[in-house]
Amino acid sequence: MEAIDINPLRLTESLREMSMIGKSENGGISRLALTDEDRKARLLFKSWCEELGMDVRVDDLGNMYAAYEGLKDEPPILIGSHLDTVENGGAYDGAYGLIAGLEAVRVLVESGKRLTRPVELVNFTNEEGARFEPSMLASGVLAGRYAKEEAYAKTDRAGISFLKALEDTGFKGEQENRIRHASCYIELHVEQGPVLERSRRQIGIVEGVAGLTCVEIAIKGTANHAGTTPMLMRYDALVTASNVISRIPALALP
């Protein structure tokens, strides 16, 4: 198959339209998972997919799949990301990965072409973890990291459970709709860092991502008179904590 060019103006306009959902006064975007803003974004994305004749389904975790048939019934090429954001998030984090995949399908439809394998777009629920901790909750269940019941029991700050939020938004589908097999997974994402810009490169291939680890450390000191206790006889917890903190950057260097 010869190369097919996308329509960059249409891609940009779709990103702009999506960014209007949850837009805040300071220019950020707030579409926390399974809120009304997230629901509106999902419905917009669903309408775009259905305009192309794609089959849209939702699994029991709220993950959305939009399928474009291939020439053969083989495991699909997955192109995915997420539509939920953190509070006052950016316009491209997550949304770009999905809408770029959508644009690829758009040009395939316009040219009357199909790939050998099916293409499936997937919108993962609660990727950010800004409403229901931890992040990547729904995809974590698919990967076997969490049990479904464990995910359902997660609550937000208002005490609303993940399960109830799925039901309230109308995005609790069936377990049989989960993705079972895939030939590969592709996700376009903004870098969110300075490396590409500084190296004057337009695109990079991700070989690894940062893994977040939260550690709680208790440092115990001894309270004493601040003016009369000699420095060599002090046990100041804050001083020790500052020494610990100052050593952390060195651990992250190669």
Kindly give the residue locations of the regions a language model identified.
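N-terminal capping segment at the start of a domain
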Residues: 2-35, 125
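Buried hydrophobic packing segments
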Residues: 45, 98-108, 241-244, 248
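Glycine- and acidic-rich phosphate- and metal-coordinating loops
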Residues: 78-82, 120-124, 218-220
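Short helix-loop-beta-strand segments that form the rim/entrance of peptidase-like active sites
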Residues: 108-129, 254
